[in-house]
Structures are given as structure tokens and as C-alpha cells.
Amino acid sequence: MTTYLKITDGLKRSLGYLDEDDSLDDGLKNKMSSALIAAESYVQGAIGTELKDFYTSEENKPLYTLVCNALAAAYVQNPVSITSGAVVNVDIVTNAIIGQLRGRYAKELEDQDGKDIESEQTDPKD
């Protein structure tokens, strides 16, 4: 799993902090970073990791960033969900965005497979 996002990519703002806010203590910054890593891991696990540059493409990065920040914010606001291993219900919007990214991922994977595999021609003698 590769991490692509930092807490300044929208997570701080979604939790009510400014990106340039220096009043955050290291504990909260670490909690945000850990939550973001967990969110990215969840999202990538739900979608796939075979396609290089899928999550950083111009088309997909905004949705990927949005869903990861929403999930990470939920983790920060409900820390028991991470530490106790309790099941966290992913809301309908998060599920919908993950579903949309899954569709894009499947299409891109299909397109890439079509380019990577040469079509086999039948022998005219057959």
C-alpha cells in the first residue's frame, strides 16, 4: 500500500483547522496522519492496487482525496474505532464514492489488459 496524501491535503480543513495552523500539538498531528494512512489503506484495499498512478491521476485524485479525508476525519473523531478494532460503518456517501472509483478502476484495468495482451490470430490452415 502506498500513501499519497498528507494531512494538509484537506484533512485538517475538514476537521476545522487551517492548513497553516501551528497550534496543533504533535499528538493530534500524529493521530491525523495515522488516521489518513488507515483511510488510504482501507480505500486502496476496497478498490485495488495493481494500476500504477490510478490514485494520482488527474481524473481520480479529487475523489480519492475526498473519500480518504472523509474516512480519516471519521477515524479522528471516533478514535475507539481504530484502537479497539471495532467495526466502523462506512457511510453511504463514502460507499458511493468507493463504488465510483471501483468502476473507474475496473474500466482502466480492462483497458490496460487489452493493450498489454496481443490478440491471437488463428492459423489460416485451421
Tell me the role of every PLM-derived stretch:
Residues 56-126:
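Short loop/turn elements at secondary-structure junctions
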